[in-house]
Amino acid sequence: LGVSEDADYDEYEEEDDDEDLPQDESDSPPDVPGTLALGYLACAPLLAAYEWSLATSAEPTRSTAEVCLFRFLLPLGEDAHLARQGILLALLIVCLLRLARHSRGLGLRLMKVLGEGALWALLLAPTLMLCTHLLGGVEPPAGFSVEPGAAPGLARAAFILGAAAHEELFFRVILYSGLYLTARVLMVHFGAGLTCARLVGEAVGLVGSAGVFAALHLAAFTTWLGSGGEEFEPFVFLWRLLAGIALGGLLRWRGPGVAAWTHALFNLGLLLGAGPEMGF
């Protein structure tokens, strides 16, 4: 997958026994399936929180990313949610089996993913504000920042956490990878060198997935999914575009688990009134 090729995820990889290691470890390729498996396992609590929020809410709201991910289940009607849960559970089992032979220290690696996500969540808001200030030309709308208010309901907080995980799976893992691979294959087909093709693929995947991420928060682009979405506001759109680029970079560098927990904890902070009013 394009999201993890050439990335250094060795910090989250468990060393094999000596006889399983290649003679030259520096030449060994990154363990893409292992990285994705660890990332999905780290996302499991977030996805479970999302399912719980849907089950306990009187009028459940669904994430746009989740609707897009599982739109192919619509013909199943009322059984679609059971099929979705079955797919998520099956993926979890596959990931557990993939990581079984490297299970020693797995809990520590998962805690490192969560801790790193919390750290990046703290750094993300000031980084986005600095970038929007440096770019200039747009001003935050009135009421963009709020003071901490009453604590949200538990179901709402669970939804916010789980929706972030679905957005990382859809916009970063799937869409980023798809755009990257498509652009890379096309560049090679038209005679570009492999290095050039990779760079173009990275740019197309990173910016393209971030642009779609920002656009699918707007009513103009979500009418085909049903009600919901916001009116276009330049600052908020730029904010989300930059957020998508930052999260895509995190995914590429640190893996999907870190990106998902960064996104989830950042949005939870916004919900609690810790920063800008508009979540992304």
Residue ranges and their predicted role:
Residues 42-63, 128-133:
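Alpha-helical transmembrane segments of multi-pass membrane proteins
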Residues 88-101:
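Central hydrophobic cores of alpha-helical transmembrane segments in multi-pass inner-membrane proteins
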Residues 36-50, 119-121, 206-212:
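Alpha-helical transmembrane segments
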Residues 70-90:
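Interfacial helix-start motif at the membrane-water boundary
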Residues 27-43, 105-119, 257-260:
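Alpha-helical transmembrane segments and their helix-start/interface "positive-inside/aromatic belt" motifs
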Residues 8-33, 108, 187-199:
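Membrane-interfacial, low-structure loops and terminal tails that flank and connect transmembrane helices
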Residues 154-280:
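Transmembrane helix-loop-helix hairpins at the membrane interface
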Residues 69, 73, 101-166, 180-196:
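Juxtamembrane helix-loop-helix connectors linking adjacent transmembrane helices
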